[in-house]
């Protein structure tokens, strides 16, 4: 029973990449402090408009996955006495209207690694200085104050980052995941009765395995660890086209329907029951990569999207519309790249090895501006994560967190190693008649797949 002694009268929990009730510190904090609560998600119309690269921030497959996660979250919230309010507005407009209509006095949101998400939060602070703003850590393994360095002193490579964490035994210091609140404060009267604009239509077919939401995330985590595949992960992780050869947790981590701390707890449980080995460590190793890019995004802000990256060194690449179109549509002279791009366009997913190969081709063989590749991934990938995506593209373009810089993959060698019988190329129709097309900009604009 909520009483008048509670800290806030009406609070807004502004969800972004925390689409869960389990281990959600935003909901837990608001539940303890508010008499009434609005649980808000903003489907920003800008996501669905063409950006500077002629692409959308969210493609059809990722929007379907997010929509499924939102639907599942609403069902979970209803079990706790709440409902999810999804508005097709920018956070500034949506939150402003709710503050006025419901006398909101507290706002809860995540400490997000994305510079644009943080900009919205800063603008809200300036516009509503009397509002109590609660920025909460919800997307990382560690709290910022636990790191053995300041954000300004974030190591300039993953190897240095990992060594500092391991030298300080910080794995044992990862906070335990929180349980879901048993009950949430009710929404203000009349909140859901106001007519709203419709959300963007879901047009992509449902993926047979990547289904959004905490329920599907839980099933994938349980199935993966029950299969024993974690004990051989290091040997299988570079396969191009098998569901069980890698964890596939990334999509649910990306929209926050799966907590990274909950996942880490499940990994620890597996190690205690089945034994830790190099493969189970490598799963944690991948979580540390994700963690590094989380803080990398927080540290470097807008430089994450800059052509010269964080190293102030301009790449010797440009933009060629014909090559760009070939890469997007999987019609380059490189069959392994074509197969990967066809898989990405058809499913919204691509293996880690596949991502490295197509990015290397984009930068080296095709000599294209890496930002266009990163933007295409942003549109197409179901598991898009702002810091990991743009940070990894910088890494491969030689303008990011790679001391060796400008890494290039030998596509013929990679094909022999990872597709020796040509099964992957055949399955995804990688062999096409294509040559590099030296065209001028007259054929622009080109519309890549959605």
Which sequence ranges carry the predicted segments?
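Intrinsically disordered, low-complexity boundary segments flanking structured domains
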Residues: 1, 27-29, 71-73, 123, ...
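Trp/Phe/Arg-rich N-terminal binding region typifying the photolyase-homology
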Residues: 2-173, 342, 388, 392
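Alpha-helical packing segments of well-folded alpha/beta enzyme cores
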Residues: 26, 69, 73, 217-224, ...
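Residues within alpha-helical segments
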Residues: 31, 215-218, 341, 374
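Charge-dense, low-complexity intrinsically disordered segments
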Residues: 56-64, 208-215, 327, 415
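Soluble or luminal CAZymes and related metallo-dependent hydrolases
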Residues: 65, 69, 213-216, 332, ...
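Glycine/tryptophan-enriched, flexible segments
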Residues: 150-306, 415-450
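Active-site-proximal binding-pocket segments
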Residues: 245-437
């Amino acid at each position: 029973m909520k009483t008048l002694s509670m800290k806030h009268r009406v609070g807004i929990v502004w969800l972004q990449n925390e689409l869960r009730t389990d281990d959600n510190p935003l909901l837990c904090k608001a539940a303890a402090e508010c008499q009434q609560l609005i649980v808000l998600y903003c489907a920003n119309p800008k996501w669905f408009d063409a950006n500077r690269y002629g692409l959308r921030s969210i493609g059809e497959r990722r929007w379907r996955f997010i929509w499924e996660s939102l639907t599942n979250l609403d069902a979970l919230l209803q079990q706790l006495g709440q409902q999810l309010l999804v508005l097709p507005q920018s956070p500034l407009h949506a939150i402003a209207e709710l503050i006025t209509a419901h006398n909101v006095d507290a706002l809860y949101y995540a400490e997000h690694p994305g510079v644009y998400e943080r900009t919205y939060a800063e603008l809200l602070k300036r516009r509503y200085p009397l509002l109590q703003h609660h920025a909460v850590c919800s997307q990382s393994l560690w709290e910022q104050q636990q790191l053995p360095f300041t954000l300004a002193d974030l190591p300039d490579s993953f190897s240095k980052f990992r060594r500092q964490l391991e030298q300080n035994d910080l794995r044992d210091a990862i906070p335990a995941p929180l349980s879901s609140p048993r009950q949430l404060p009710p929404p203000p009267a009349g909140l859901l009765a106001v007519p709203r604009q419709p959300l963007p239509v879901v047009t992509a077919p449902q993926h047979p395995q990547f289904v959004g939401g905490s329920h599907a995330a839980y099933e994938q985590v349980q199935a993966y660890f029950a299969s024993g595949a974690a004990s051989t992960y290091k040997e299988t992780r570079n396969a191009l086209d098998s569901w069980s050869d890698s964890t596939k947790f990334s999509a649910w981590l990306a929209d926050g329907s799966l907590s990274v701390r909950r996942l880490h707890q499940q990994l620890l449980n597996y190690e205690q029951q089945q034994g830790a080995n190099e493969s189970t460590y490598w799963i944690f190793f991948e979580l540390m990569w994700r963690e590094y890019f989380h803080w990398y995004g927080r540290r470097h802000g807008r430089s994450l999207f800059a052509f010269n990256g964080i190293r102030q060194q301009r790449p010797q690449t440009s933009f060629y519309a014909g090559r760009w179109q070939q890469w997007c549509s999987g019609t380059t002279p490189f069959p392994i790249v074509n197969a990967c791009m066809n898989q990405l366009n058809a499913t919204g997913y691509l293996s880690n090895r596949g991502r490295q190969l197509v990015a290397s081709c984009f930068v080296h063989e095709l000599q294209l501006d890496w930002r266009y590749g990163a933007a295409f991934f942003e549109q197409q990938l179901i598991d898009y994560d702002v810091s990991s995506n743009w940070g990894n593209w910088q890494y491969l373009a030689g303008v990011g967190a790679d001391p060796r810089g400008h890494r290039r993959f030998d596509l013929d060698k990679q094909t022999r190693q990872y597709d020796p019988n040509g099964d992957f190329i055949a399955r995804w129709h990688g062999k096409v008649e294509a040559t590099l097309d030296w065209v001028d900009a007259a054929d622009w604009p080109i519309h890549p797949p959605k």
